[in-house]
Amino acid sequence: MLFNCFGILALLQILPALAYPPCREQMSDPYEFGESDLMRPGMHDTPLSLMQKREALAISLSKRDSVGSYAPYNVTCPSDYMLRPASDGISSGEQSFIDKRIPKINTQMRSFISNTGLDVDVNSVINDSDGPRLGLAFSGGGLRAMVHGGGVLNAFDSRNGNGSSLAGILQSAMYIAGLSGGSWLVGSVAVNNFANITYLRDNVWNLEHSVFAPHGDNVVENLAYYDDLDDEIDQKKDAGFDTSLTDLWGRALSRKLVDATQGGPNITFSSIRNQTWFQNADYPYPIIISDSRLEEEKAIPANTSIFEFTPYEFGTWDNGIKAFLPMEYVGTHLKNGVPPDHKCIRNYDNAGFVMGTSATLFNTFLLEWSQEVTSNSTLYDIIHKVFEKLSEDQNDIAPYPNPYQNFTTTNTTVKNPFERFDTIDLVDGGEDDENIPIWPLLHPQRFVDVIFAVDATYDDSNGWPDGSSIVTTYERIITYNANKSVDVRGFPYIPDEDTIISLGLNTHPTFFGCDGRNTTAGNHTVDNNTPPLLVYFPNYPWVYYSNISTFTMSMNDTLSSGILENAALSATQNNSDSFAVCLACAMIQRSLERKNMSTPSQCSSCFEQYCWNGTTVNNPSAVSNYAPTVLSASTTSGTSSVRAKPIVFYLFASLLTVSLLL
């Protein structure tokens, strides 16, 4: 059993009961206890009967007989050299998907733009493989980000028949990327045959119960649940692989996100390729990202390597490596691209483990917590001992056998940061403060023309985004593109957070980079190397307060419906037909510029209204004073002022303790 991992988690859950040191996003909001997070009062104090223990074990064993194994296994490698240089462009598999998807995108986008009434010859703008390419990017932010992003995605989806003015945008997109809570959204739709959000919410996500207590106050079912988790992780450990908190986290998440018995212990991310929607290229190509952390690091540097998981490949475009491993062989340790003894690993890319990797919040939580707790010396000592142990044991990360050991790239100016390590340690995709997965959509080989960046980040003390995620991406490009450690096409100019808040750029969708000749790439003729136009969709209380804590792990129907509705109305600007026209303008702008076609007068008006015009504001108090209120009354039942109740961490400890006694 994973006594180390469970013991650490148990201690983490108990500590908040002793004191309430705030996380960064909870400075003004102490832990609240909600009924949806609680099990029956006093449950953990009541001794379990022998009958209850036996019943839980019987349930657990019966379920295990019907599912596959979580354990990775050895296979013979398909070739002696397993890495693909990224200088070749995107993989042949991704290219094949894109080639199949282009005609479908062109048809859908022509239909969407025609339906908006935009006065443009859509057949001239969208007629070949050089037509507009749209990428969707969904931020991190736990369950808040998943449900908010789901509301936006629902508004973009033409399958719903809900009269959304933006219906068809999903079907018009080439890529869809997610990190952390956004990876739960992207991963869940991709793994579940791209089911729509209504189906997932009603049948899969089980939002009313916490991932830590999925069966509410049913003691026996919850004990069986933890016994199943323990058994699955032991399968991987017994097969000879390192395990970490992320295995536990990923298996628990899978039961919320994957529509299969026990969350599909043997369902892999690469198996998405076998699903009907993917084989037909009916929906955008999914990408999940995660940050790397070197063994000696406790904090994530701004220039950390960003890794991506796709149905075909795992790797990074950063110039220190710039090479990819086939996704189905993730978990294979390579030396200079060659597998020892011709042995490769399969089944390591478990879908839940991948989503858990992108959302490994534990080390950020611990780091900030350990820095905040100073008033109680005993508590301070306990927390720091736990923190030091995690750092030493690397249990706060997701360990991946290193495919880049002793690997040397063709780029002689940047060193491979992982060349001496046996494992690559991956952490939450937002820990570098780039909390929207824009990065994978900026690579020249993907030719993305416009990015819709959906931001549900908890930036300020009140829980609303202030634009810092796109500011950080902009700063990374300015800093590291210059020294050639990264290779992207550039980015639109982005103002600082003071300006974003002072000008209200985070209160509605805002366009950046409307003029393709005025970006970080310089004043050049617009072509396929021009940086994309960015449409920023911030979370904002249009009809509902959706600024719940990242550590909220359950929602009742009123709350989830309120967040979904608020997200849709905020994204569509109250289902505005005129805003749909403006989004159509953003979608085709780079194509118009490339083809040297004139901008329609409707688009000129749109750009005056929604594009940042370059104005900056020096207002240091803007961020701290930002506290928006709802614009109008919600049509959702209940009140819009309902706040979510974050998970009661210490109850998880009691469950773990009891389950370990089985």
Swiss-Prot record:
Q: Which InterPro entries match?
A: Acyl_Trfase/lysoPLipase (IPR016035), LysoPLipase_cat_dom (IPR002642)
Reactions catalysed, semicolon-separated, are: a 1-acyl-sn-glycero-3-phosphocholine + H2O = sn-glycerol 3-phosphocholine + a fatty acid + H(+)
Enumerate the glycosylated residues: 74, 127, 162, 196, 266, 274, 303, 376, 406, 411, 483, 518, 523, 547, 556, 574, 596, 613
Identify the GO cellular component terms for this protein: cytoplasm; cytosol; endoplasmic reticulum; external side of plasma membrane; extracellular region; fungal-type cell wall
This molecule's function is given as: Catalyzes the release of fatty acids from lysophospholipids.
PANTHER family xref list: CYTOSOLIC PHOSPHOLIPASE A2, LYSOPHOSPHOLIPASE 1-RELATED
Kindly provide the name given to this protein in its UniProt entry.
Probable lysophospholipase 3
